[in-house]
């Protein structure tokens, strides 16, 4: 069920996700974790929206429900939803877990076009987040929000500019995170070039 939902793209496949959630698939047992997984697969593909998320949260009032709800809101494929998630990640006082789930929801490769506008914003707020948030929140933000959704020479150049200029005096831990993320993107670009 997870593999199917995670790769569903056609209207019929997306309708099947809704059918799974509705309990009409014989022999499929859906626990809370699988329900959220299937639901979020639908959210990130535009099948379900904010009202549906509210309904799911009403069904699952546990701590896990709140975490998955935060992820679901960040998975909504719209510029407005991504902007709200980015703002929450970088400015709100979220718990470590809610913050992590929001980051993971925000940064989804299905939403590359929507997320392209957030590359510069990431590098603009990085130092402030590092200086004003606790270590775990700052480290999670630096790592999970690194703009891996736009694998390009331009993103590598922006990371290098941050290392050379904006973040030249940043903490060793933050610089290491950006260096490692930049290097991973350089390797990805080389792999792409080799495949062509």
Annotate each PLM feature.
Residues 1-196:
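Long, ordered, helix-rich scaffold segments
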